[in-house]
Amino acid sequence: MDAGAFLDASQRVPPPAPTTWLSGIFETILGAILLWVVARSIPQANSLLRGWVGMLALILLLHFGTFRIVALLWQSLGVKAEAIMSAPLRSTSLGEFWGKRWNLGFRQLSHELIFRPLHRRLGADATGFLVFAVSGLIHDLVISLPARGGYGLPTIYFVLQGTGMTIEHSRFGKRLGLGQGVRGWCFMMVFLAVPVFWLFHPWFVLGVILPFMRAIHAL
């Protein structure tokens, strides 16, 4: 997140709207129900499905719910604290999804440490592709290494994201309108969803997520 804005006492923000609170509370409760009720009801024979439901529930419970409520608490005190997720499915391009709406904390770090120092030397597209490659390696460290399998698949996933964003920014992509509207949204979802099993591969779901769910008595 933007620590400078967070610590700047001169930047005061208005209190969040009640509907924003309701959204954060709803997503927290829904995530908890999916994690401790729905996932448990899935037969043990469908372990991979169990793990996927539990993993999505954790993302909803934490990233979209609890972390959002924490940000709202700070905002109610006048502090400029942004939620790390900003309605990512409203994006109409990969660039908007990864750059403005998904996991803004990681986006801030990668922008400060990689993109800003290198984009003038390498160009925006090449530096953006490099950011995706580095993101893939980091996700391999936190996903594949603990799972002891699936090495390289998260990196390939993020390289594909960089490839998709390069296509969006190309003349061909602009001519087809891939960075906007319904067509842009569909193009984005193909790149995000079709290869997502390379990011959260079975080794991770079965070897990390399921044991974690048992540890928190979700199974």
Region spans (language model):
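Intramembrane catalytic core of multi-pass membrane enzymes that act on lipidic substrates
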Residues: 1-77, 83-85, 91-92
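Transmembrane alpha-helical segments that form the membrane-embedded catalytic/substrate-channel core
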Residues: 2, 60-77, 109, 162, ...
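Hydrophobic alpha-helical cores of multi-pass transmembrane domains in eukaryotic membrane proteins
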Residues: 29-34, 133-137, 159-163, 190
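Hydrophobic core segments of alpha-helical transmembrane domains in multi-pass membrane proteins
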Residues: 52-60, 132, 154-161
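Interfacial helix-loop-helix junctions of multi-pass membrane proteins
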Residues: 143-155
